[in-house]
């Protein structure tokens, strides 16, 4: 990854115009902080993707018991390790790798989860990433009243694509409460992954 104070770029992953993939930009900071305010972290917290550390910093301002992040990128992990040195009062854990591989190996349940990953070209699955993520955490790491807030450019609280034959279909419909709130923010014209003047704070509460 190419990381500076303004953005994170992934030169190994090109778009159709051969531009380095935009992973994250500094304009997102107030939106990320709003996401964490909505999550209202407590207990054991899991984050998917460390990014520029905006959400991690916000999470660790709350009286949580532990903070765990799953992160795949070596350069972002270096940034995480520097950040961790400043966080002396919390139990902080790093799981290095792809969440698609690591979540099935976790033997712990979490109270709060924040999901803001980036595409992983090395993972070849047909399901949308968020759908796959919810399936995996339902099996392994959520408990009654676990809260999930997800980064989103659209007002789709659950953002889950279940087929009519999917065994999760009935279960998910009966076991979650979904909400979505619009967040006004100026998105720069050169951002390729979000457009307009709004982002969305999408929240799921699991009632399993």
Language-model segments: residues:
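A generic alpha-to-beta junction signature in SAM-dependent methyltransferases
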Residues: 39-40, 63, 140-144
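S-adenosyl-L-methionine
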Residues: 72-106
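Conserved SAM-binding loop of SAM-dependent methyltransferases across substrates and taxa
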Residues: 52-64
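Conserved class I S-adenosyl-L-methionine
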Residues: 41-51
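C-terminal substrate-binding/active-site "lid" region of AdoMet-derived donor-dependent transferases
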Residues: 76, 83, 121-208
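Class I SAM-dependent methyltransferase Rossmann-like catalytic core
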Residues: 1-42
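A short acidic, Gly/Pro-enriched loop at the edge of an enzyme's catalytic core
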Residues: 104-117
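Conserved SAM-binding motif I beta-strand of class I
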Residues: 66-71, 150
């Amino acid at each position: 990854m190419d990381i500076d104070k303004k953005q994170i770029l992934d030169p190994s992953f090109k778009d159709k115009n051969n531009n380095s993939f935009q992973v994250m930009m500094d304009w997102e900071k107030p939106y990320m902080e709003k996401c964490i305010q909505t999550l209202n972290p407590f207990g054991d917290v899991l984050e998917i993707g460390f990014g520029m550390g905006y959400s991690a910093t916000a999470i660790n301002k709350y009286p949580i018991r532990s903070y765990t992040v799953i992160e795949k990128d070596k350069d972002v992990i270096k940034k995480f390790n520097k950040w961790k040195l400043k966080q002396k009062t919390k139990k902080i854990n790093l799981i290095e790798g792809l969440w698609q591989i690591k979540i099935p190996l976790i033997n712990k349940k979490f109270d709060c989860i924040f999901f803001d990953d980036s595409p992983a070209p090395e993972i070849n699955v047909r399901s949308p990433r968020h759908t796959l993520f919810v399936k995996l955490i339902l099996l392994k790491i959520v408990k009654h009243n676990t809260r999930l807030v997800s980064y989103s450019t659209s007002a789709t609280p659950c953002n889950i694509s279940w087929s009519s034959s999917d065994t999760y279909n009935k279960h998910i419909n009966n076991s979650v409460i979904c909400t979505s709130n619009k967040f006004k923010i100026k998105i720069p014209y050169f951002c390729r992954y979000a457009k307009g003047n709004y982002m969305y704070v999408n929240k799921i509460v699991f009632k399993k």
